[in-house]
């Protein structure tokens, strides 16, 4: 009992604040930065913007505090029951003698929760139009290719090997982490970094690549900041994340999606040997076409020479004919002048003889009179013929003549004309007119 008393007297005494601070130091110094996986429960968001909740597993509970700046960086809604992995530091809160985890980063885990977040994020970005951009064509032979991936692992080796095998070109590697808390930010910064390079150093196409894995492993490629960076890129992007069955949001914002990293390299450059064969084929076609064209024009030149010789001969003949015609004209001109002078003298004599002029005019008047008389007689006969024809037609249409041919006109009691059985159905008295008279008929 005395020993217990002495031991009790030797025990160090602490104040409440001192022991609380000691516990705080013990927790923070021994655990440092940790990751904890669990299920969110009791979530509360204060007016200050800070979030308070418990992270639980079976019956164990860990209090968590997520300060407003950290909460603002989380791109998906927090819900009770959501499985998450939290990174942060352990500390104690002296106000109620409990330890808590101060959240620095929070990522979803568990397939159901992650798919829900993925679908909600996809719907949001799709509504903003980030998946409907005009795709930039992949250049045919890029002189520089940017590759964003992990510097370690098989992916970068496969891409380099495939490009060198198909068509060697300059490869610029921007190493990033392809998995983990800050991976999405690193890849987004790499895309922006390539776009901000000087034009002479800028790649013509960017490959964003990673090998296969679970949805948790590929989660960085669903980051909103990464999708926006891919959408805003002025350099075409080929996404090659996972295997053919794996789909991430960057696939929807990229300009082309490759099923594998190796396929991305094949999309980026053609096969050099195939290009050489194609060029050789085109060269043969060009040579054949050129040869045919030269032969065609050579034949045209031969034909043009023949035409030239023919035209020269034709022109010479025409020139000779023209010369001969000129000589003939010179020989005939004096005779022509003499003939015209004779006609002028004869015409002058006739003009001074009035009797000849009167006889000429009288003869001309006689001819005109005979022509006019004949024309008038022909016109008169034509009118008489038409008059006779119209008179005959008019007589044939006279209803008296029609009655003489056996027809009759039937009228009703009031003198109305009856032209059909229907109009005569209600009549009792009929007046029937023939060519030689009219009779009255009463219906029995």
Curated annotation (Swiss-Prot):
Q: Which reaction does it catalyse?
A: Exonucleolytic cleavage in either 5'- to 3'- or 3'- to 5'-direction to yield nucleoside 5'-phosphates
What terms describe the molecular function in GO for this protein? exodeoxyribonuclease VII activity; nucleic acid binding
* Keywords of the record: Cytoplasm, Exonuclease, Hydrolase, Nuclease
In terms of Pfam families, this protein maps to: Exonuc_VII_L, tRNA_anti_2
Any one GO BP annotation for this protein? DNA catabolic process
Q: Where in the cell is it found?
A: Cytoplasm
Tell me which GO cellular component terms the UniProt record holds.
cytoplasm; exodeoxyribonuclease VII complex
Q: What EC number(s) does its UniProt record assign? A: 3.1.11.6
What does the record list as coiled-coil region(s)? none
Identify the PANTHER family for this entry. EXODEOXYRIBONUCLEASE 7 LARGE SUBUNIT (PTHR30008:SF0)
Family from the record: Belongs to the XseA family.
The protein, known as = Exodeoxyribonuclease 7 large subunit
Q: Which organism is it from?
A: Rickettsia conorii (strain ATCC VR-613 / Malish 7)
């Amino acid at each position: 009992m005395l020993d217990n008393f002495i031991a009790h007297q030797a025990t160090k005494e602490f104040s409440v604040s001192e022991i609380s601070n000691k516990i705080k130091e013990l927790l923070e110094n021994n655990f440092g930065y940790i990751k904890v996986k669990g299920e969110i429960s009791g979530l509360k968001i204060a007016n200050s913007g800070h979030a308070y909740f418990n992270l639980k597993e079976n019956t164990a509970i860990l209090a968590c505090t997520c300060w407003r700046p950290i909460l603002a960086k989380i791109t998906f809604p927090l819900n009770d029951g959501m499985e998450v992995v939290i990174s942060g530091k352990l500390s104690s809160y002296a106000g109620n003698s409990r330890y808590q985890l101060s959240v620095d980063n929070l990522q979803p885990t568990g397939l159901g929760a992650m798919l829900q977040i993925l679908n909600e994020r996809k719907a949001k970005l799709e509504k903003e139009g980030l998946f409907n951009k005009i795709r930039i064509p992949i250049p045919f032979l890029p002189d520089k290719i940017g590759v964003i991936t992990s510097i370690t692992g098989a992916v970068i080796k496969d891409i380099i090997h495939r490009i060198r095998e198909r068509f060697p070109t300059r490869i610029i590697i921007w190493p990033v982490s392809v998995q983990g808390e800050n991976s999405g930010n690193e890849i987004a910064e790499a895309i922006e970094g390539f776009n901000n390079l000087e034009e002479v150093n800028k790649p013509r196409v960017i490959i964003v690549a990673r090998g296969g894995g679970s949805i948790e492993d590929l989660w960085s490629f669903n980051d909103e900041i990464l999708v926006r960076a891919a959408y805003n890129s002025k350099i075409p992007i080929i996404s090659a994340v996972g295997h053919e069955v794996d789909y991430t949001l960057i696939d929807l914002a990229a300009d082309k999606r490759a099923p594998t990293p190796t396929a991305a390299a094949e999309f980026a450059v053609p096969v050099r040997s195939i290009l050489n064969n194609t060029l050789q084929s085109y060269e043969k076609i060009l040579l054949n076409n050129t040869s045919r064209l030269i032969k065609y024009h050579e034949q045209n030149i031969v034909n043009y020479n023949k035409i030239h010789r023919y035209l020269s001969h034709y022109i010479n003949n025409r020139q000779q004919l023209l010369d001969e015609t000129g000589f003939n004209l010179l020989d005939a001109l004096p005779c022509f002048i003499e003939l015209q002078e004779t006609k002028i003298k004869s015409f002058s004599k006739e003009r001074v003889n009035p009797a000849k002029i009167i006889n000429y005019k009288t003869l001309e008047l006689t001819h005109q009179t005979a022509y006019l008389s004949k024309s008038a007689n022909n016109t008169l006969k034509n009118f008489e013929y038409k008059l006779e024809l119209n008179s005959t037609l008019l007589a044939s249409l006279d209803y008296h003549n029609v009655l003489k041919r056996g027809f009759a006109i039937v009228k009703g009691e009031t003198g109305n004309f009856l032209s059909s059985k229907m109009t005569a159905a209600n009549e009792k008295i009929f007046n029937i007119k023939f060519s030689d008279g009219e009779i009255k008929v009463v219906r029995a």
